[in-house]
Amino acid sequence: MLTKRALRTTDPYRRVLSRGFSVLNRPSPNYPGHVPLTTLERGALAVGSAIGSLINPRRADLIAALGEATATPYFIYRLRDVMLSDPTGRRILRNKPSINSKTLSVEYLRSLSPNTVGRTYVDWLDREGVGPDTRAKVQYIDDKECAYVMQRYRECHDFYHAITGLPVVAEGEIALKTFEFANTLLPMTGLSMFAVMRLKPEEKERFWKLHLPWAVRNGLASKAVINVYWEEQLERDVDELRKELGIEKPVDLREIRKIMRRQKKMAEEAAKTKKRY
């Protein structure tokens, strides 16, 4: 059952419409870094960041802006209510933990047993050459609690990568974003599927045949991953957690790509040899 606080704020349309303003009388920020936007500004931000991120998928700032601009006035409130309806989700909202290098000791994570959640996470970070301090701070979501929900989603994203094993290459990111869309319904994650157009032909084929069915099936069937208190799961067996969440590990994308490159190289060498003789 939702709390009275949740019921008071469940109607985001009423709250947004009741606080109209213009660029000339912009209200004070609701939290550090907050930038209040008019409806027109939010629409322009959504369109501009969508086009920019499609042109250059490596622009994390544009992807972050797109996520915030399209999350309101409904979707981020819905995800917040998903957390409020779950005991662990409510604890996360109450404690507001943050995932970064100051709150998670990399040395400690590397000392854990190989198949634990924490070790799987840090091994994935090392393999992909990324760290926990790369997530931009939320700016464009007005409600302070909903801004935290978006921040929490961002900071947990690499844990989703780790337990699925999907790499940060475009093919892996699109597969994970599709899973996230089925699980969270955040529009930005669904819009990321348009990036499939930029993939190579063989990568597109793998996405439609392998990654899309896996992402939709697991995203819909698994528990809400936003409600996982990752900081409390670090020493737990990762296979056990996957089973509890209802997440099947997808095919090893890096291994598939490695095999495909090897086969392509062998075919090219065979063609050169045949041409020579």
From Swiss-Prot:
Highest taxon listed in the record's lineage: Eukaryota
Residues engaged in binding Zn(2+): 157-158, 161, 173
GO (cellular component) term, any one: extrinsic component of mitochondrial inner membrane
Membrane topology: Peripheral membrane protein
EC top class, as a word: lyase
Range of the transit peptide: 1-14
UniProt-annotated location(s): Mitochondrion inner membrane
A Pfam family per the record: Coq4
Keyword hit for DNA-binding: no
Keywords: Lyase, Membrane, Metal-binding, Mitochondrion, Mitochondrion inner membrane, Transit peptide, Ubiquinone biosynthesis, Zinc
InterPro entries according to UniProt: Coq4, Coq4_euk
Swiss-Prot/TrEMBL GO biological process terms: ubiquinone biosynthetic process
Lipoprotein found in the keyword field: no
Co-factor requirement: Zn(2+)
Recorded metabolic or biological pathway in which this protein acts: Cofactor biosynthesis; ubiquinone biosynthesis
Catalytic activity: a 4-hydroxy-3-methoxy-5-(all-trans-polyprenyl)benzoate + H(+) = a 2-methoxy-6-(all-trans-polyprenyl)phenol + CO2
Enzyme nomenclature, EC number: 4.1.1.130
Family: Belongs to the COQ4 family.
Self-association state and partner proteins as the record states: Component of a multi-subunit COQ enzyme complex, composed of at least COQ3, COQ4, COQ5, COQ6, COQ7 and COQ9.
The protein's role, per its UniProt record: Lyase that catalyzes the C1-decarboxylation of 4-hydroxy-3-methoxy-5-(all-trans-polyprenyl)benzoic acid into 2-methoxy-6-(all-trans-polyprenyl)phenol during ubiquinone biosynthesis.
Protein name: Ubiquinone biosynthesis protein COQ4, mitochondrial
